[in-house]
Regions:
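Membrane-proximal soluble regions of multi-pass membrane proteins
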Residues: 2-17, 74-114
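Membrane interfacial helix-start motif at the N-side
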Residues: 11-32
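Core segments of transmembrane alpha-helices
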Residues: 30-43
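Structural signal for membrane-spanning alpha-helices in multi-pass inner-membrane proteins
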Residues: 42-45, 68, 97
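Hydrophobic alpha-helical transmembrane segments
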Residues: 54-59
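Transmembrane alpha-helical segments that form the membrane-embedded catalytic/substrate-channel core
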Residues: 60-73
Length: 114
């Protein structure tokens, strides 16, 4: 895995970095809650036509995630350096959590960094 100062070049490399940065279960659960709440809010906005509330989707999603990084994981969110890949990875992680694959991903990444 690359150091914090080196630039990650591929999404596969980034995914391993992302998983390592989300090693604590509470971090993953807080991301899950924020992502799901932002999706529910987005559905409400689309259905109601209240587009002025759109920025709240980002606020809700990122508030839970950033809280987890600063107070649970004690690291800096990857969003600051890799915004697009981080956004995509949040949804990939939620999908893996819903399908029961995320814990295995964490273990795989931990084992590869020994």
């Amino acid at each position: 895995m690359k150091s914090e100062t080196e630039r990650i070049e591929t999404y596969a490399e980034f995914w391993d970095f992302y998983v390592a940065e989300h090693a604590q279960p509470l971090t993953r659960y807080l991301h899950f809650i924020g992502t799901m709440l932002s999706l529910v809010l987005l559905v409400w906005i689309v259905r109601s036509g209240n587009w002025l509330y759109s920025p709240l989707c980002l606020v809700v999603g990122y508030a839970f995630a950033w809280f987890a990084h600063f107070f649970v994981e004690h690291n800096k969110p990857a969003t600051f350096k890799y915004p697009f890949w981080s956004f995509v990875s949040d949804y990939k992680m939620v999908f893996f959590m819903l399908t029961g694959k995320m814990n295995a991903e964490v273990e795989r990444v931990k084992a590869s960094n020994i």
